[in-house]
Amino acid sequence: VSAPRQVVVLGASGFLGSAVVRELAADPTVRVRAVSRRPVPLPERLAGRVEVLTGDLTERDVLARAVAGADAVLPFTARIRGASGWRLSEDDQEAERVNVGLVRDLVALLAERPPGAGGPPAVVFPASNTQVGRVTAERIDGSEPDRPEGVYDRQKHAAESLLKQAAARGLARAVSLRLPPVYGPGTATADDRGVVSTMIRRALAGEPLTMWHDGTVRRDLLYVEDAARAFTTALAHAEALSGRHFLIGTGRARPLGEVFGAVAHAVSRHTGAEPVPVVSVEPPAQADPTDFRSLEVDPSAFTAATGWRARTALDEALDRTVSAVAREAGAASRP
């Protein structure tokens, strides 16, 4: 099993996209093309292995140039939050254009490939485990019927469906990886804005960590390096996985009260100060019912097919993330 030679990462300056670029660039048999609005920061040892293109991928000619000659495409471009910084609204046309339209354009470009341009490329898509919608069980394995509820989940589901149809037509070897919340060190172009890093920033500032519930709501949280490795693993197995979606996660959801407590202690280990308190507060008016439902991921189908599994322990992942966030905060405070 081997990864494709020319791999194009779209949205390569984002939090997860940049981690996947680093993972791919470490493989000398792979040529990486990193495409985004902003240049992708790379360690000096990897910079010579990556072709960097900048441009607006919602412009079809830019996308066409980006994916020309690709053996594989990983589309990480996404709009997650609305203009208010909160969840997407129904009338957010820019979000639809980025989250669905870009994949629609990609499929159209693949359909226009001339005969003899090589076999169908691998496409590994970052989906969300919440696009299943409301489920009665707290543990899901990917076999459940999908009933996506929120705008973002419906858009992810629509894009995933387009790629499954492309696989059925023989246009791509398309695989969808449905991710839980991913956390870890950010980059110069993309902070991790998820709940874990948000709480780390609060703890570093000496502020209490607030929960909208009693702390028993459980979440499966995945370290960014484990997530990036899932994508490179899926690329290497794209032929066998094509046309399907797989759940990715640790297989163990943790109570958020326990996670926040672990964050407080990780920051305490870094600073030497006492751990900040973890407290329950009233939820804001815009809180969603999904914020109060537990969800655990069973990734065994993907593990059985590829051998991948999450391998970074929570405390180790938190220590790495705390160190990175503290460095960012220190750099930002210097004149």
Q: Language model features by range: what are they?
A:
Residues Q6, D27, A313-P335:
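Amphipathic terminal alpha-helices
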Residues V7-A26:
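N-terminal Rossmann NAD(P)H-binding glycine-rich loop of SDR-like oxidoreductase domains
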Residues V50, T54-V98:
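NAD(P)H-binding glycine-rich loop region in Rossmannoid oxidoreductase-like domains
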Residues P75, R104-V151:
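Conserved Rossmann-fold NAD(P)-dependent oxidoreductase catalytic core, especially the SDR/UDP-sugar
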Residues R134, E149-V175, L204:
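Active-site Tyr-X1-5-Lys
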Residues H157, G170, V182-S197, E207, ...:
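Glycine/proline-rich active-site loop of Rossmann-fold NAD(P)-dependent oxidoreductases
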Residues G186-R193, G215-A228, R244-A266, R311-T312, ...:
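Substrate-binding strand-loop-helix patch
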Residues H237-A287:
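Mid/C-terminal beta-alpha module of Rossmann-like enzyme folds, strongest
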